[in-house]
UniProtKB/Swiss-Prot annotation:
Its cofactor is Zn(2+). It comes from the Bacteria. GO terms for biological process: alanyl-tRNA aminoacylation. NCBIfam families: alaS (TIGR00344). Binds 1 zinc ion per subunit. Its EC number is 6.1.1.7. This is Alanine--tRNA ligase. The lineage of its organism: Bacteria, Pseudomonadati, Aquificota, Aquificia, Aquificales. The gene is alaS. Signal peptide: none annotated. Keywords: Aminoacyl-tRNA synthetase, ATP-binding, Cytoplasm, Ligase, Metal-binding, Nucleotide-binding, Protein biosynthesis, RNA-binding, tRNA-binding, Zinc. SMART domains: tRNA_SAD (SM00863). Consists of three domains; the N-terminal catalytic domain, the editing domain and the C-terminal C-Ala domain. The editing domain removes incorrectly charged amino acids, while the C-Ala domain, along with tRNA(Ala), serves as a bridge to cooperatively bring together the editing and aminoacylation centers thus stimulating deacylation of misacylated tRNAs.
Length: 871
């Protein structure tokens, strides 16, 4: 078979390690602090700030195998997936990078050595392309490597010039192609396998290119594509890490791959999308109706729709998660940790969407019937988009169903609706991200960095390195000014990992600065945000930095309690529980976790009891620093969407809890004192939230609750342990009284029928119509139900005016509902009342803004009924 995909990955990373590159583990699919991207879609994305000069790494050469997802924006492969042999949503990108170290010659040498000597690709089958004006790259390939000129293609800017954006770093690129033989045509014969980008210019706003002082290298080789070449496969979907998923699709559908194009498309979609949703959800992206979650939901539903086309009508994708995890857990051990969680989320999504899928078919049939009845030849863009967006149907399937009925679809209108939706999605996720301000980038250029010493110290003598006032770097801050101070060392913890920043005082004998918050706007820079209360503080001053100790202790109690809570949830609810977000403040903690149903009172009680039990045991809280992979192998839990370095801190609470964490903690669980859950709620599909307190704040809340309980028991005249029973009794009494009141209202309304409702004969029909004041819609329906049963050929039109608006009901006797369709009548009558409505054939209701038009609407109804014959 040649090399396996796992072997190729390891060969690549090992090769570049031997060339002095640092192996960097894949970043999560969710990019960190990048407002331009929904997902990491290229190997260079985690290094973007390094290329931009905003971040420094302890190495100048790196190599990685990066998880990527291309589903939106410029690199949107979603709708192509399944129809071609190469497009994927999820893929792995092998890359080597140089940050101002080596350049073209070495990059080309390394690439050539790897493909010819390690992968053993025949030199005579390899071609390269260069940018048409890049003479340097041409000469290296031709004269130094020895590739004849006829196998070097000069291509234009569209093919061989890379740029990060309209402005910023850019440069020519060079690509390596393999000739697969004369039996293939076009791109399938000359298959691009590696792209080398020579980042050597900066493009300004006028389009002018200026050479960079330290040019960079960024290369990318798609693992799936090179595996298909080395394994002799015609399609990426036939390689060893994907084809088992094709076989899974065959098994659950009963279809065979390779017999029919439509079947092959569906099986490829299922295989690709299974990988995408497994990795994305494992990285903490929960399916939802906005932002990243919306994209993952669309991918999941697209796979289900294609499964539906194969005749699969029950949830099935969740069964394939195990296969993805088993294939990919060696290079990505985090998949094993989240296996059960991902399966639970996917199964829940499938169960909900199966119902939607069926109702979606009903919706499409409904809009087709409507179009035909109106004499239209086309389904509108909005109708198509609703089927696509709400019910998750692919456009080509909608087109196919419409074509069977002799209809076309408005693709242009659909695209407009789709663009509007994409814009809404872009806005929804941009809000959550923040870019590095130029002032912080400038500080880094000046070589200013801060070191955190707050694990060991809450007070520290140190030097002022920088001061910012109003986004400007200044030499001093004066009394009354608000600003930011950067210290050489700081005991103040900057907000991160869910923990809020410290507050306190920075002072000298000349000035006092009150620190209200501490942040890390970019790697290496810690800013103390606040106000100068007295005097002045200048750059180079030696200051005394003092953290608010009591507040820090409150935060530490809450942070360690968060770890105990996480462990308790996993212990009592199951291993599927994973942290999905947290906030560790001074007065409370907030913990979001993955679970599929609300917690019962008994579960909440048991969780609270278990955490307090571990607090009473006074477990030692230990801190160890180790390599990331080593930490995972010890059983430490890594948190979704958190970015970890090569070395990590492992926080252990005895044997009960072990997590990767950079936050501050107490030295023993007994220091927490007391833990109390304040609330439990939902924050989205498959995600629950617990708010809790510890220490003095928990005691205060418990005292306030007891005081309130005492007041309530006194007001009710019962003992404290009888309060709940008394409240339940009062609720029952109120419910009974409300029933009596409702019954009396119905009787009064029945009496008002004679006064308010008129009766008229229209051929075989009897029409009842009239207007009431302040009658609820449900009461209107009840009255209409009574009136339509009088003769068996009754039509009812009654309404209620309230606060300048009107609610109305149209009903017909059930025996005549096919001839007198209330849902059609109400749409036309509703227009007169400046509103609308809908419902069943025998009963429909609506609302409008023109109560004074009731008589006019009655007149229209009579005209409509004049042409009705019920026999």
């Amino acid at each position: 078979m040649g090399f396996s995909a796992h072997e190729i990955r390891e060969l690549f990373l090992s090769f570049f390690e031997k060339k002095g590159h640092t192996r960097v583990k894949s970043a999560p699919l969710v990019p960190e602090n990048d407002p331009t991207l929904l997902f990491v879609n290229a190997g260079m994305v985690p290094f973007k700030n390094v290329f931009l000069g905003l971040e420094k790494r302890p190495y100048k050469r790196a190599t990685s195998c990066q998880k990527c997802l291309r589903v939106s924006g410029k690199h949107n492969d979603l709708e192509q997936v399944g129809y071609t042999s190469r497009h994927h949503t999820f893929f792995e990108m092998l890359g080597n990078f140089s940050f101002g170290d080596y350049f073209k010659k070495e990059a080309i040498e390394y690439a050539w050595e790897f493909v010819t000597e390690v992968l053993k690709l025949p030199k005579e089958r390899l071609y390269v392309s260069v940018y048409k004006d890049d003479e340097e790259a041409y000469r290296i390939w031709n004269e130094h490597i020895g590739i004849p000129s006829e196998r070097i293609w000069r291509l234009g800017e569209e093919d061989n010039f890379w740029q990060m954006g309209d402005t910023g770093p850019c440069g020519p690129s060079s690509e390596i192609y393999v000739d697969r033989g004369e039996e293939y045509e076009g791109e399938e014969r000359y298959l691009e396998i590696w792209n080398l980008v020579f980042m050597q210019y900066n493009r300004d706003e006028n389009g002018v290119l200026t050479p960079l002082p330290h040019p960079n290298i960024d290369t990318g080789m798609g693992l799936e594509r090179i595996a298909s070449v080395l394994q002799g496969k015609n399609s990426n979907f036939e390689i060893d890490i994907i084809y088992p998923l094709i076989e899974f699709g065959e098994e659950v559908s009963g279809k065979k791959y390779g017999e029919k194009f439509e079947t092959d498309v569906a099986l490829r979609v299922i295989a690709d999308h299974l990988r995408a949703i497994t990795f994305a959800i494992s990285d903490g992206v929960i399916p939802s109706n906005e932002g990243r979650g919306y994209v993952i939901r669309r991918i999941l539903r697209r796979a289900m729709r294609f499964g539906y086309q194969l005749g699969i009508t029950e949830p099935f994708l969740y069964k394939g998660i195990d296969l993805v995890v088993d294939i990919m857990k060696e290079p990505y051990p985090e998949l094993e940790l989240s296996r059960d969680f991902v399966k639970g989320i996917v199964k829940g999504e499938e169960e909900r969407f199966i119902r939607t899928l069926r109702s979606g078919m009903e919706y499409i049939q409904e809009v087709i019937e409507k179009a035909l009845s109106e004499g239209r030849k086309t389904l509108t863009g909005k109708e198509v988009f609703t089927a696509y967006d709400t019910y998750g149907f692919p456009v080509d399937l909608i087109q196919e169903i419409a074509k069977e009925k002799g209809l076309e679809i408005d693709l242009e209108g659909f695209q407009c609706e789709l663009e509007e939706q994409r814009e809404r999605a872009r806005k929804s996720f941009k809000i959550e991200t923040k870019e590095v301000k130029p002032v912080y980038a400038h500080l880094k250029e000046l070589g200013i960095t801060s070191r955190f010493v707050g694990y060991e110290h809450l007070e520290y003598e140190t030097e002022v390195l920088g001061i910012i006032v109003g986004d400007e770097i200044v030499s001093e801050i004066k009394e009354g000014e608000e600003g930011e101070i950067i210290l050489r060392e700081t005991p103040f913890y900057p907000e991160g990992g869910g923990q809020i920043g410290d507050s306190g005082i920075i002072e000298t004998d000349k000035g006092i600065f009150k620190v209200e918050d501490t942040q890390r706007p970019t790697e290496g820079i810690i800013v103390h945000i606040g106000k100068l209360l007295k005097g002045k503080i200048s750059v180079k001053d030696i200051v005394h930095a003092r953290v608010d100790k009591e507040r820090r202790w409150d935060i530490m109690r809450n942070h360690t309690a968060t770890h105990l809570l996480h462990a308790a949830l996993r212990n009592l609810l199951g291993e599927h529980v994973r942290q999905a977000g947290s906030l560790v403040a001074d007065k409370y903690l907030r913990f979001d976790f993955t679970h599929f149903s609300p917690l019962t009172e008994e579960e909440i009680k048991r969780i609270e009891e278990l955490v307090n039990e571990k607090i009473r045991e006074n477990l030692p809280v230990s801190v160890m620093e180790m390599a990331y992979q080593e930490a995972l192998q010890t059983g430490a839990i890594a948190i979704f969407e958190e970015k970890y370095g090569e070395r990590v801190r492992v926080i252990s609470c005895g044997e009960f809890s072990k997590e990767l964490c950079g936050g501050t903690h107490v030295s023993a669980t007994g220091d927490i004192g007391y833990f109390k859950i304040i609330s439990e709620s939902s924050v989205g599909a498959g995600v629950r939230r617990i708010v809790a307190q510890t220490g003095r704040w928990a005691v205060n809340t418990a005292f306030e609750e007891h005081t309130t309980l005492k007041k309530v028991s006194n007001a009710l005249g019962v003992k404290e342990d009888e309060v709940v029973q008394k409240v339940e009794e009062l609720k029952e009494e109120i419910k009974e009284k409300e029933k009596e009141i409702q019954k009396l209202r119905q009787e009064i309304l029945k009496l008002q029928i004679r006064e308010k409702v008129k009766e008229e004969r229209h051929r075989e029909l009897t029409l009842y119509y009239g207007v009431f004041e302040d009658v609820e819609p449900e009461e209107l329906r009840n009255l209409a139900d009574i009136l339509r049963q009088r003769t068996g050929k009754d039509v009812v039109f009654i309404a209620s005016k309230k606060e300048g608006k009107i609610n109305f009901v149209i009903a017909s006797s059930k025996g005549i509902s096919k001839e007198v369709r209330a849902n059609e009548l109400i749409r036309q009558v509703g227009k007169v009342l400046k509103g609308g409505g809908g419902g069943r054939e025998d009963l429909a209701q609506g609302g409008g803004k023109a109560p004074d038009k009731f008589d006019e609407s009655v007149k229209l109804l009579k005209e409509l009924l004049s042409g009705v014959s019920v026999g």
